[in-house]
Structure formats: C-alpha cells, structure tokens
A protein has these predicted regions:
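Short connector loops at helix/strand junctions that flank enzyme active sites
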Residues: 26, 56, 72-74
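A short, polar/charged loop-to-alpha-helix boundary motif
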Residues: 50-60
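Disulfide-bonded cysteines in secreted/extracellular proteins and peptides
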Residues: 45, 56, 94-97
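Short beta-strand scaffold segments in enzyme catalytic cores
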Residues: 25-36
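C-terminal binding/interaction regions
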Residues: 1-21, 63, 71-144
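A short glycine/serine-rich beta->alpha loop
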Residues: 43-52, 83-87
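Hydrophobic "anchor" residues
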Residues: 39-40
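A glycine-rich beta-to-alpha transition motif near the start of alpha/beta enzyme domains, typified by
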Residues: 66
C-alpha cells in the first residue's frame, strides 16, 4: 500500500459526521498529513454555529503531528468529506489552513495537497500561496 492509500485509509477510519451538541458538529471533513519522518497523523473538523469556533481537519491533523511528534515539516496532505478528493476544488484547504502550514514551517511550501485521488494529481502549497507575506520573516527565523 502506497503512502496516499495509507493516508486515505487512516483518515477514512475517523470519518463519522455527527452532532456533538445543538451547537457543534464534527467529523464531516477528515484529513491526514505525512510528516517529514513518514509518520501519518489524522484530524477531523469541528464547527460551532456562532462562527467563533471552527477547526478544520487539516489544522487538527497538524496540531496532532506537532503534539505527538514535535515535527513541523509536512510532505503530503489529504483532506476530504465522504469520498476522496476528485478535482474541481474538492480537498483544497481554506486560507487559514494554507497560512498555518507556512507559519508552522516555511518549508511546507513544498508539501503536496492531493487534488484528485484517482489520478493522483497534486498541488504544492507554494502554488496555492505564491507570494506569501511571511517569507522574509521565516527566512530570518531559519537563519537564527
């Protein structure tokens, strides 16, 4: 089984859309990230009705990666609802997730997002944010 298949299977295992309360629902989007060392971490989204609480599956997976391994560099990311990414924007990260990936580690610009699971079409984070505002600051941090 290849990495993308393993990521899909691990994320699919936690796909379980449900209401947590009258105000919060969860698990309707799931994600898997492959860390620099090859470990796979998963996460699911949680959303609240008033808008102040929303955690995307991608960021949840990234939090888990950092919490359980201390890693910040990502190689691959896969996110989906009820089926694998199929193109046409499915599986693409929101702006907050794109930003968090780069703020976590500027080298994540080379990370690949799965766009179409069937054809294995991917896109790099750098293509999603070609002129990131934090590039200079990140370079200075890396030079410390």
């Amino acid at each position: 089984m290849g990495t993308w298949e393993k990521m899909y299977e691990e994320a699919r295992a936690i796909y379980n859309p449900h209401e947590v309360s009258d105000f919060v629902y969860a698990n309707h989007v799931v994600a898997a990230v492959e860390a620099e060392d090859g470990q796979i971490f998963t996460g699911f989204c949680m959303e609240g009705t008033c808008g102040v609480f929303h955690l995307c599956a991608e960021r949840a997976a990234l939090f888990n990666m950092y919490q359980f391994s201390g890693q910040t560099k990502v190689k691959k990311i896969l996110a989906f609802r009820d089926k694998p990414p199929y193109g046409e924007g499915s599986g693409m990260p929101c702006g907050a997730c794109r930003e968090f990936l780069l703020e976590l580690n500027a080298e994540n610009k080379e990370a690949e997002f799965m766009m179409n699971y069937e054809t294995r079409k991917t896109i790099k984070v750098a293509e999603l944010i070609p002129y990131w505002w934090g590039e200079e600051r990140a370079t200075n941090w890396q030079d410390k």
